[in-house]
Structures are given as C-alpha cells and as structure tokens.
Amino acid sequence: MSSNSVVYWGTGRRKTSVARVRLVPGNGTITINGRPGDNYLNYNPAYIAAVKAPLETLGLGTEYDILVNVHGGGLTGQSGAIKQGAARALCELSADNRKPLKTEGHLSRDPRAKERRKYGLKKARKAPQFSKR
C-alpha cells in the first residue's frame, strides 16, 4: 500500500465485537488482525461470505482490499462487525452505495445480545427444578 493511496474507514459492531475496517484499492484480499481472512475465520464459508457480502452487493469484490482490526466476542460476532464496518466504509466511498447496502441490510446494527442472568434462576431463563413437595 503506497502512502498516498485513498483509504476509506468504517466501524462495525455486533454482540460484543468491534471492528475497524479500512478499504484500500487492491485485488480483494482480506486481512484480519494481520492474518489472512480465511485463516482467521477458520475457513468457514458462512463467515467469509458475510465479510465479502457488502462488496459483492456492489460488484466490487476484486477492486478493494479489506484491512481489519477487530476485538471482542467470537467469530460470529466479529464477522458480523466486519460486514457492517465494510458497508459503512463503502458508503464513505460513494453516497450512491448507501441505498443498495441498506436494502440488503448490511448497514443495520443487529441488536441481539446475550440476555442477562436473573437472580433466582440458573441462567437467563432456566429455572431450578420445581418440586411440589
């Protein structure tokens, strides 16, 4: 990457994961925390497809490299955070990209998170065994 090349930034969040995504003109390689993307995501096709989805929606799969710093959570949350961060970076690239990305749902934050444990219960909703006597 040359020092004068254009870089587009986007931040994504999912569950407890936070991803800072940079889009750089290139050939479509994905680098996550300094490792190749498919290696970092354990070669799981669902995670890899989720990361590439925003670029594929716009047909830019081989035009930009994705460089990511991500922390927190597991691979599901991290891949979702990277997807949202890449979509936000593509919106920064051009305002025309926003509508198709929004239609496909790449820009919306998934609000689902782990439910808190309540006192008197073993887990969030699991109650101790009921005894009549």
Curated annotation (Swiss-Prot):
Residues 114-133 have a biased composition (Basic residues). InterPro entries: Ribosomal_Su5_D2-typ_SF, Ribosomal_uS9, Ribosomal_uS9_bac/plastid, Ribosomal_uS9_CS, Ribsml_uS5_D2-typ_fold_subgr. Residues 98-113 have a biased composition (Basic and acidic residues). Residues 98-133 are annotated as: Disordered. PROSITE patterns: RIBOSOMAL_S9 (PS00360). Coiled coil: none annotated. GO terms for molecular function: RNA binding; structural constituent of ribosome. It comes from the Bacteria. PANTHER family: RIBOSOMAL PROTEIN S9, SMALL RIBOSOMAL SUBUNIT PROTEIN US9M. HAMAP family: Ribosomal_uS9_B. Belongs to the universal ribosomal protein uS9 family. This is Small ribosomal subunit protein uS9. The lineage of its organism: Bacteria, Bacillati, Cyanobacteriota, Cyanophyceae, Synechococcales.
